């Protein structure tokens, strides 16, 4: 939008607590049960505590993002002064999750100036299962780090919509294929040298990291890696072994989808009635997800599915409701009513027998 600055990361005004985040994850999982919900955290002191809360909020994947951030939309102050090495944030996150018995139910991804197979091996030993590459991949495609991504003036045509500048782009998909092929080959060679068959076998194995011998520089001997390489000795998993239980198998939408099958499949007009309680969260999200997957953003014809509710609806009532779906609630609704409304209609009315007038 002209005149509106692009700042990364943007503020999220619907998330002020772990409970808010848990509700967002629940909403998104309802819309697309097959999606892996990822939460990105900046590597910093104390990130382990936040990561534990994110794991309890049922995120499927936690990203620990280190270094200064590669996006050209970052404020200069953030690029210069924010962010620490990903090793520090990853190590703290791994130790905290294992200590609290949460590590087995989440995937850990790390990014931040990863460039070589050695970087991948070290990050895996510190606890990561997935690895993000951004800056190095952009450079492979021709990026010259002008940091003009948000100004539409990229001189090599990597990040711009300007047709003349885009003509300067010389990147090819083969370059990326070669880069990651060589990267994987280097990882394979390191694994063979260590004596393991799979990358999974070294995840969380900080005991395999050996400090370099004395190089004669006295200052190096003052650095202690004990905290960074500490390994929590308990019976908890040290890598992802099981999926999160999101509790979406018994939401109100499962019942609605069964009753509204004719409307969803054949666009037949149907009216339904239900009682609803404040434990029924994200009502309509899964229904909308199924309709959107089948018909796209156009949804259903107008007034195809009309659902009337009575009671006190839980959070995110009518979230992401698509065209052709009408919700009428006689009662009250909680936070995030009509969140992300996508063309559907929601009417909330006081109960018929209420005694108040305002």
Q: Residues of each region from the PLM?
A:
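Feature marks extracellular polysaccharide-active and adherence modules
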Residues: 290, 310, 320, 328-332, ...
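Catalytic cores of alpha/beta
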Residues: 46-56, 115-127
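Terminal amphipathic helices with adjacent charged low-complexity linkers/tails
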Residues: 61, 65-70, 196-249, 330-333, ...
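Flexible glycine/proline-rich, aromatic-decorated loop/lid segments
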Residues: 59-70, 80-93, 125-165
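Active-site or pore-adjacent capping/gating segments
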Residues: 131, 139-206, 210
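The right-handed parallel beta-helix/beta-solenoid scaffold, focusing on the short coil/turn
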Residues: 303-305, 317, 323-325, 337, ...
